[in-house]
Amino acid sequence: MERNTRQRNAILAVISEAGRPLSTQEILVKGQAVVPSLSIATVYRTLKDLTAEDCILPVKLPGEADRYEITTLGDHYHFKCSSCSKVFDIHGRIKRSSVPAPADFVVERYDLILYGRCSDCINKPQSPQRGHDPFKRSILE
C-alpha cells in the first residue's frame, strides 16, 4: 500500500535532493524543515516503505547504521569523510574484469568505499590543541 502523504513526499524530496547518502537523523532534521511535526517513527516507517518500493536504497557501511539514497543513481561508489563522517557519491564505473578475485572465482557484485577527508574538512582551520598557547614560546626552543 503506497501512502502519499506530506511527510512521505518531504522525506523522498530530502533524499532525492541531497546529492549524497543521508543518515536517518539527517533525513529527520531536513524533513522537519518542511514538515515540523515529522517524527523519527514516521521517518523509519517511510524509509522501510520506500526501500520496499525500490524508490531508495540503503547504503551499508561496516559497523554503522544505514544511510539512504535514491535508486536512480546508477553505478557509483562511496567516499566517507573520516573527520565529519559524511558519505558522498563517486560516479564512475570499474570493469568487473579488473576487480581482483581468487583464481576460478566469479565476481557477481561489489561495493567500494573510499575513506579520507572531504574538501570542507580539509579547508577548516585547525583549532589549537587544548592547553597549548600558540603565542607562548618554549624555553627549550
Where are the regions that the model predicts?
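Short alpha-helical segments that sit at the start of domains
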Residues: 1-13
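Short capping segments at the starts of secondary-structure elements
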Residues: 17-23
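A short acidic, leucine-rich amphipathic alpha-helix
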Residues: 26-32, 43
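Alpha-helical DNA-recognition elements
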Residues: 33, 49
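Short, hydrophobic-biased segments on the C-terminal half of alpha helices
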Residues: 44-48
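Glycine-centered, phosphate/nucleic-acid-interacting loop/turn motifs that mediate DNA/RNA or nucleotide
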Residues: 54
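Non-DNA-binding regulatory cores of transcription-related proteins
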Residues: 57-58, 62, 66-141
